[in-house]
Amino acid sequence: AEDKLDADKAKELVDHQVCVITMAPIVNEDVAKAGVKSLTKDQLISIFTGKTTNWKEVGGPDEDIVLVTRPGSSGTRATFQKYALDGNEEASNASMETDDSGVLLTNVKDTKGAIGYVALSYLTGDAGVETVAIDGVEPTLENTYSGEYPVWTFEHMYTKGEPNEVVSAFLDYITGDKYGSQMEKLGYGVSSKMTKTEH
């Protein structure tokens, strides 16, 4: 909250971690069918920074890599850049940049050779794209919970000061098991199932 408010106002807020968002690299189905099912973190960094420009360089088809990314203001991009790319800047000048994760997914689906990233919540049905493992670890909630998969963050709710009884009851409901099972069906992780609470 401190990057959005001045420090004095931010100090009044109490942070409540309410769920987990896992981000997954996704590729056009033709790339996956040609054998790209997993990339090392170094390969992922090389692709998203524009150094690797053809899929054959990472065991895929002889096809140009098309980057589909989010803008610099995106929280999805910030999380992916920090944990999947080790903080390396994406080659935005060489990518199709979109403000919306749903549009990004459609662009990856419809563009030969495309790669991008979305939250698992966008992949609950038949999305028409394939996820890519990082260093052999699939982007799943189970692998996020165990701490094996590295690209995740918490979603937050904030209260001004400690929550009152009604707000506490709502937060308990949001973070409880019954609501948690619904969140998992929608691709969101349950905070209490995390074995790691920090990266």
Model-assigned labels for residue ranges:
Residues A1-H199:
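Exported/periplasmic ABC-transporter solute-binding proteins
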